[in-house]
Swiss-Prot record:
A zinc finger (C3H1-type) spans 24-53. InterPro entries: Kinase-like_dom_sf (IPR011009), PAN3 (IPR030844), Pan3_PK (IPR041332), Znf_CCCH (IPR000571). Its main location: cytoplasm. Regulatory subunit of the poly(A)-nuclease (PAN) deadenylation complex, one of two cytoplasmic mRNA deadenylases involved in mRNA turnover. PAN specifically shortens poly(A) tails of RNA and the activity is stimulated by poly(A)-binding protein pabp-1. PAN deadenylation is followed by rapid degradation of the shortened mRNA tails by the CCR4-NOT complex. Deadenylated mRNAs are then degraded by two alternative mechanisms, namely exosome-mediated 3'-5' exonucleolytic degradation, or deadenylation-dependent mRNA decaping and subsequent 5'-3' exonucleolytic degradation by rgb-30/xrn1. The keyword Cytoplasm applies. One of its GO terms (molecular function) is zinc ion binding. Residues 75-96, 107-117 have a biased composition (Polar residues). The gene is par-2. The lineage of its organism: Eukaryota, Fungi, Dikarya, Ascomycota, Pezizomycotina. The N-terminal zinc finger binds to poly(A) RNA. This is PAN2-PAN3 deadenylation complex subunit pan3. Keywords: ATP-binding, Coiled coil, Cytoplasm, Metal-binding, mRNA processing, Nucleotide-binding, Zinc, Zinc-finger.
Amino acid sequence: MAATRYNSGDLRRQVGSPRAKNRDTKETLCRNVVIYGHCRWEDSGCTFNHDQNKASVSQTDLNSNRRVFNVESPSFTPANQQQSAGKKSTFSSQAASAAPFTPRGVGTSTPTLQQANDSTIFNPAAIREFTPQNYDVGNTISQNGAQHVTQDGGLYSDPFSISSLGQTMPPQGQYNPYANDPNNLAGAGAGLYQPAGFGNGLVHPPNYHLYQPPSELYRPSLQPYQRTTYDFFIPKDRRENLQKKLFHMQQLLPNSGLPNLDRWHSLFPLDTKATRNSTCFGYPSWMYKAQNNKNGRHFALRRIEGYRLTNEKAILNVTKEWKKIINANIVTVHEAFTTEFFGDSSLIFVYDFHPLSETLYDHHFPPNNSHNRLRNTNKIPENLLWSYVCQIANALLAIHNAKLAARCLELSKIIWENNRIRLAACSILDVLHHDSPNRKTIEELQQEDFVKFGRIILALATNTPTLNFNNIDAALATIVPRYSTQLRGVLEWLIKPSAPGETKTVETLLGGITTHLANFANFVMQESDEKEFHLMRELENGRIARLMFKLSVVNERGDSCGVHNWSETGERLLLKLFRDYVFHQVDADGKARLDTNHYLNCLSKLDASSEEQILLTSRDNATVFVVSYRSIRQMLDRAYGELGKESKPSATGATI
């Protein structure tokens, strides 16, 4: 390799400051200070500036003086011409951060010549710092330079807040959360958040995982007498399902454009498809969730679009008969009325609202998103089909005994929730066809109910929608290898016409499926026992909550009952020490001990007035008491009773 042309001593020698080139040398920061942190010739004649703070200020002043005459600007404009045009050369702090003005249209108040002159002036103060696009919406500046205060009350706000994100989201179509499969909501929390199109911003549902227990695969080995924290509360699946129901019941759709009816407000669309479908009723129909103004309850509204009522007695007579039917497998009908709030003549039916329900069609024939076809699901268990048979038969028994007919028996008009089905479109066809000249008799309509009943079960058994049936006999033959002959016999009896002189009845059907009725009743009673067991455990949790109310009322109370510092005197002091014993324990390192089992154990013993004795110690370790749970419970009741004597009764009259 070629030898270097410099000596090693020259490389180690510090390079001197460059020679001054202009009159601003004293304001220029020395290069040695920038590179090495100091200058060797600072006291030996170096004419450059060696004070970094002074250099930054001087450089700022220098730049401000050079704003008007900037060699990098596109063109040169004298300063006097600016002032003659009425343009100020100074900028306020608020105007410096103002966004560049962009005219909305051609017709602006500024002349074209003035715009051309202003565009050639380079204004460094008007250049804003970089902020993420579409997120700088927390603060807005008006045209006069005044800055508006956000809703939070502060001058500055978080640009990534939920309210800011909602303002920047592009408008999208109305989002319907019921279009998703409810089963997917429980998986890994993926379906627990609404998409961006829902409302004006991101909507976060409750945190269902607050009491989520660990996986059963890693459940610790416990003795028979030991319990985990989650054993004291309602099971996670049942609790999560109930919380989802409450959440969907209170769900709103802001700016939906739906009107408020006379006694109904907060309408929320429930249809999973936005297409008009008039197959069942002959008119397009829509489903909404609404809240009643009088009682605050939520109901389901079925709207028949474009129907003009000609006989008011049709609504009164039909709804009067259907309101009498109260059945576990029928959605109760409350009333019907007409309205023009939707811009047309619509007929509204009011039903009970069952959150998290979906139609039987959507549950068993979900669409395949990739091919937009009905996905061929797996075989439906036979015991589930028999469960559907028993439930629909129960509904038809109540309807036929009331001298009525279900009429609208279709997969899309039966709602499903955890293998519980309900007929959800009763009474509608009775009103629509009330004055029809070709109206059939009740006996004929009841016989049609059996045929529609059989076609529903056959569609589920063959994984084929009812509308795709071309040959009933061929469809019945396909279920023989997969299901029992008894199920096929029931379907043939339902679908095929009866022999001359015979009439199908629900009693005859129930007589042929008694074994399955007994199995279904056994399953329902076992589920009822399980719910009662969990309800009893929640009852104990309610007793603990009442104890917590009493302890919170007594502890840390000031002057009361004519006694100064009442909660710190007498036996009330023991209640405070007991509170510390239960909730304020620490470990050997002085850190807080968080043990839910300890909380529940102590409060349960206090509720039971156990004779077990515990050691209560003051915070300064100067006072020690040995007392039983029974004594503490008596002290708590006496202290709460003293407060009750001097207090006024509550407006609701509720007591603990």
